[in-house]
């Protein structure tokens, strides 16, 4: 029996904050995400996310597996954060960060096991085509993605609003499916 604990879902917030509270905090959640500490201490959200990203991503993650090139892992995370919601191949990522496909696959597998990112395969009625299609990568939490990019600008000043919404909706759907 395995249970996955995700960042707080909109459904959970609805129970504690009500519909009005959920609507009022929506932009904040698109930018800062839904980790419990971030929700409970909104004034310190940036600092909490930077600390979480640095300790969780770099200390805990590097201790978990023998990551020989931590700088490369950082570059890969940045590349994934910049290309969130876009179809991307391992080959393209390898070229972007300057390594081989095998290393990219290993690091992405590690990031998935640590519940930082998840991937969705493209859909096709032809199974062979579906297997060949590039994947889309998403972050479990928008706040972690934005901490990696060091971008907490308001939605009105951002170029990636569509990507933030898509990542938010997909991660919310994932939570709803897991908790159902």
What do these predicted ranges mean?
Residues 14-25:
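Helix-loop-helix "sensor" segment of P-loop NTPases
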Residues 10-13, 144-145:
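A generic structural signal for short hydrophobic patches within well-formed alpha-helices
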Residues 2, 37-39:
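Phosphate-backbone binding and catalysis cores of DNA-processing enzymes
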Residues 39, 43-180:
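Accessory nucleic acid-recognition modules appended to NTPase machines
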Residues 1-11:
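A short helix-turn-beta junction within AAA+ P-loop NTPase domains corresponding to the substrate/partner-engaging
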Residues 1, 19-20, 152-154:
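Short, glycine/charged-enriched secondary-structure capping and boundary segments
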């Amino acid at each position: 029996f395995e249970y996955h604990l995700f960042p707080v879902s909109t459904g959970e917030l609805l129970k504690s904050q009500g519909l009005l509270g959920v609507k009022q905090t929506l932009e904040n959640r698109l930018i800062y995400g839904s980790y419990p500490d971030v929700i409970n201490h909104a004034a310190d959200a940036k600092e909490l996310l930077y600390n979480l990203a640095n300790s969780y991503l770099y200390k805990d993650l590097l201790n978990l597996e023998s990551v020989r090139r931590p700088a490369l892992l950082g570059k890969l995370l940045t590349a994934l954060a910049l290309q969130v919601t876009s179809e991307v191949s391992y080959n393209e990522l390898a070229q972007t960060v300057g390594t081989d496909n095998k290393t990219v696959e290993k690091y992405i597998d590690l990031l998935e096991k640590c519940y930082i990112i998840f991937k969705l395969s493209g859909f096709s009625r032809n199974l062979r085509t579906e297997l060949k299609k590039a994947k889309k990568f998403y972050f479990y939490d928008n706040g972690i993605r934005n901490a990696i990019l060091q971008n907490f600008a308001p939605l009105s000043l951002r170029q990636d609003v569509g990507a933030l919404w898509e990542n938010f909706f997909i991660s919310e759907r994932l939570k709803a499916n897991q908790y159902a």
